[in-house]
Regions:
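P-loop NTPase nucleotide-binding core
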Residues: 71-266, 311, 322, 601-602, ...
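Extended, charged/polar low-complexity intrinsically disordered regions
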Residues: 1-21, 26-29, 149-154, 491-496, ...
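The catalytic "switch" region of P-loop NTPases
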Residues: 237-375, 379, 416, 420, ...
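Conserved nucleotide-binding/hydrolysis micro-motifs of P-loop NTPases
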Residues: 96-99, 311-315, 390, 400
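Short acidic, S/G/P-rich loop/turn micro-motifs used as interaction or catalytic elements
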Residues: 68-69, 98, 276-282, 314, ...
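P-loop NTPase catalytic cores that bind/hydrolyze ATP
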Residues: 123-166, 170, 376-417, 485-527
Length: 718
């Protein structure tokens, strides 16, 4: 039995916890509180290539799934900027700002009494946009004050204090004006503009000018010349946003910011936008159309946005995509430029560097002292288990510390398999079980369960292929791996949600045997462990390099069968309701989804679960909850102990303020208990009523496969 002293074991736990950190949780020394970001940052690419790209004076989208290190890169960037003389930064957690924005009901009531006011629903949305922008400006102001007071600027602080004070007074003035009735009058006049714009553009110009004269700033101008034209509905919404934005006089604000910061020698303001993809789709568009795109275009190269986003959850709006950098952090985008073996080697090396950096700092030993067996194979299996995702890797190390190290057992291949299995069951598998309780329409919940049907078909096929025979398979010693499959790249969007939730990962792009470009996906390592699917690819033979694109791994027919069964393509015109086959979808898309039957309706594509329709219909509507509240219950259920809001926030990748607010709502519903501990900190604890309602074992919680699971007698890797 291996033994390690208590200090070394504690250091391993700290190393694991440092990788588990979410969002803006500081990477710091536990006792001294000193920042460790410079010492422990490990760039995914050699020579700090990712950091250097993000540090360019250009707008950048940093794109990756949860846990890929977007916020860590932002922290490292800010640390770097604090040592420069010509740039500064402002971090804005968009999701938290959005959640905290409120519509003033008294102001809404006053607006609805005006004859020229917009409809109440539209007013509520616009006022929400206004509050959202106000909060963003306040965040930037707060960060700039910290920068002015920083030690780097001590020598110049006295010379600029007066200017900075004036700047902040100006910001406060702008915020105050947003709540005055002249702001409301501008909205009222704009209503007439929208109604007449389609009929005669010259009349529209006159009315826009009228709106400008009401503003408190005589120099403020509102012009229709910059309006984009996509559709009448979209044009209307964007014009509202422009009136709102220009009522804040953002262009003037940026000019004043620039003037003050130029006195400090600052040439660029980097605004770091985190959790962008956590916003609802409508809010995401508003943020870009009303805030990011105008600031990016108006600021004369002064403001540079760094935007953290999820793959497939992006919206560029008027931002010129050819003029921004896009940095991807998931494994294929990072390392997939060569052949698959080189990609794996690069990802394994990043995993090794990441773990070694943390273990050497917190334990002062090499990671191999915790391993048993072939060290090279252990690193390979750790990569397979986490797909080079730092946060997932942290959870795996935490589980390994808990299940093996503190019990005197070293980490081997079986231990990694068990940790991955546990991670899948605790962190990933619950997506479908909780999905049926999501406070959304039946169609939305059915769409989630349709993906469960797709995943079941994929996993079932992978299990069936274990008994497949071919010339290539006969050359493989032992059980051949079936964890990967390929589909034409045009089918990728069907798997995007499953990938975003870590059921699978895009592994590579290759040309299949017929020369067609295909996307290769890898099933989650823990999922493969649970369902006895051997993971990886064989090595040793030249022809094994094309193993992933063998014809029996082509799942195109499976996808087409799923679409035929679950996808509805229907015209939304109540008088038409024409239904179309999947084969006609490409042609319909070329005409902007215009219905070819009635020539007026829009064709809608919906994925519905027929297999689980009865189960979804049977859910008591009183049990439906927002996603964040379901996440709180899931976390409390898994941890099996009372937790502080900050700890829950760490698991759910959100702010502790949001957890506190939603925790109170759950307590009001009798689902959790909110009681202070001895130190006066309020703790949340799941109640038996919630356990019974949401977590009672049901036959369909796990994947419903036709055949029973086989005995897991082998590790899941080749």
């Amino acid at each position: 039995m291996a033994t390690w002293d208590p200090k070394t074991l504690q250091g391993f736990q700290l190393a694991a916890d440092s990788l588990k950190l979410y969002r803006r949780a500081d990477l710091s020394e536990p006792e001294q509180g000193v920042s460790l970001i410079d010492e422990l940052y490990v760039d995914p690419l050699p020579e700090d290539k990712v950091l250097r790209t993000v540090a360019h004076a250009s707008t950048t989208f940093v794109i990756g799934r949860k846990g890929t290190g977007k916020s860590t890169i932002f922290q490292r960037l800010q640390s770097e900027l604090r040592r420069t003389k010509h740039q500064t930064s402002a971090y804005v957690d968009i999701k938290t700002v959005f959640e905290s924005s409120q519509v003033d009901p008294l102001l809404l009531e006053r607006l609805t009494k005006l004859d020229s006011a917009l409809p109440p629903a539209t007013l509520e949305r616009i006022l929400l946009y206004k509050e959202f922008l106000r909060a963003v400006i306040a965040e930037i102001k707060s960060e700039l004050r910290k920068r002015v007071e920083a030690s780097l600027w001590e020598r110049v602080k006295e010379t600029v204090t007066h200017s900075v004070s004036e700047l902040f007074e100006g910001l406060d003035s702008v915020l105050e004006e947003s709540n005055e009735e002249r702001f409301i009058s501008a909205l009222g006049l704009r209503t007439d503009t929208i109604k007449t714009k389609a009929a005669e553009s010259s009349e529209s110009t006159t009315k826009v000018g009228g709106a400008a004269t009401v503003s408190a700033k005589p120099s403020l101008s509102i012009s229709g010349e910059q309006t984009s034209h996509k559709s009448q509905a979209t044009d209307q919404e964007r014009n509202y946003g422009e009136v709102l934005l220009r009522s804040f006089d953002i262009k003037g604000l940026i000019s004043r910011l620039k003037e003050v910061l130029e006195e400090l020698g600052i040439r660029n303001l980097y605004v770091l936008i985190d959790d962008f993809s956590e916003l609802p789709e409508e809010a995401m568009k508003v943020v870009v159309d009303v805030l990011l795109a105008p600031l990016n275009n108006w600021s004369d190269e002064f403001v540079k946005f760094k935007i953290a986003a999820y793959p497939g959850r992006l919206y560029f709006g008027a931002i010129d995509r050819t003029k921004v950098d896009e940095v991807y952090l998931d494994v294929f985008k990072l390392y997939g430029g060569g052949e698959v073996g080189r990609m794996e080697d690069s990802a394994i090396e990043f995993t090794r560097r990441l773990v070694r950096s943390r273990i050497q700092h917190f334990c002062s030993v090499d990671p191999k002292v915790f391993f048993e067996g072939d060290e090279t194979e252990i690193w390979r299996q750790l990569f397979f288990a986490c797909m080079a995702n730092p946060r997932m890797l942290g959870h795996l190390l935490h589980f390994l510390h808990e299940s093996h190290l503190i019990r005197g057992r070293a980490i081997g291949l079986r231990a990694i398999q068990e940790a991955a299995d546990r991670y899948y069951e605790e962190k990933i598998e619950s997506y479908f079980r909780l999905g049926k309780f999501l406070h959304e329409s039946f169609a939305e919940r059915s769409s989630i369960y349709s993906l469960k049907e797709l995943l079941e078909a994929v996993v079932g096929r992978a299990r069936d292929l274990k008994s497949h025979d071919s010339e290539v398979i006969r050359k493989i010693q032992g059980q051949h791996p079936t964890s990967h499959f390929h589909v034409p790249v045009s089918y990728e969007p069907l798997f995007s949600t499953l990938e975003l939730n870590f059921f699978l990962t895009k592994y590579f792009e290759m040309s299949d045997r017929s020369g067609q470009k295909v996307a290769v996906f890898a099933l989650n390592y823990g999922l493969c462990s649970k369902y006895s699917i051997r993971f990886g690819r064989p090595t040793g033979e030249r022809e094994f390099r094309l193993y992933f694109v063998e014809r029996f791994f082509d799942y195109s027919a499976l996808v087409l069968a799923f679409l035929a069964k679950n996808q509805e393509i229907v015209c939304d015109n109540p008088k038409c309701k024409a239904v179309f086959s999947h084969e006609r979808l490409d042609a319909i898309q070329q005409y902007g989804m215009l219905c070819p039957s009635c020539k007026s309706g829009t064709v809608r594509v919906t994925n519905l679960s027929r297999k689980y329709a009865a189960e979804l219909n049977a859910v008591n509507k009183d049990l439906l909850l927002p996603n964040i509240e379901l996440g709180i219950l899931q976390t409390l259920h898994v941890e099996k102990e009372p937790m502080r809001p900050a700890a829950i926030a760490g698991e759910l990748d959100c702010s502790y303020q949001l957890i506190g607010k939603r925790g109170k709502a759950l307590a009001d519903k009798g689902l959790v208990d909110r009681s202070p501990n001895e130190q006066g900190h309020r703790l949340l604890k799941i109640l038996p009523t919630a356990e019974a309602a949401y977590f009672s074992t049901a036959p369909n919680d796990a994947l419903n496969l036709e055949s029973d699971q086989e005995n897991k007698s082998q590790p899941p890797s080749a």
